Amino acid sequence: MKIKQKLVGKTELKVDILGLGCAPLGGNFVDLTYENGAKIIKTALQAGMSYFDTAAWYGFGRSERLVGDCLRHKKYVLSSTAGRILKPGAVQNPLDFGMIDPIPFNVMYDYYYDGIMLS
């Protein structure tokens, strides 16, 4: 199946009009295993999808890790947030943030130039 694509602004970059939002793959309000998350990404790729959205906030990096592992050596377009930097150290109550099983990082917000470039 070929997903329709559109050009991004005045660039030559083409992006699918439908993408996979990967917040649940980070365990945001969902208890999802790494293996099941990988199956979701594999199924999306087999369906012809090449646009994925992830962020440091999703499982405090868990989604980014899974997406990176699954898309390595593939052709894709990735979107993410900026200004959220992962720092080592687990949060005390991850459920307060809607995280079921995050990896042991905490998010620091930095919307200045250096923080945007780091994220």
What is the predicted function of each stretch?
Residues V91-S119:
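Glycine/proline-rich, positively charged
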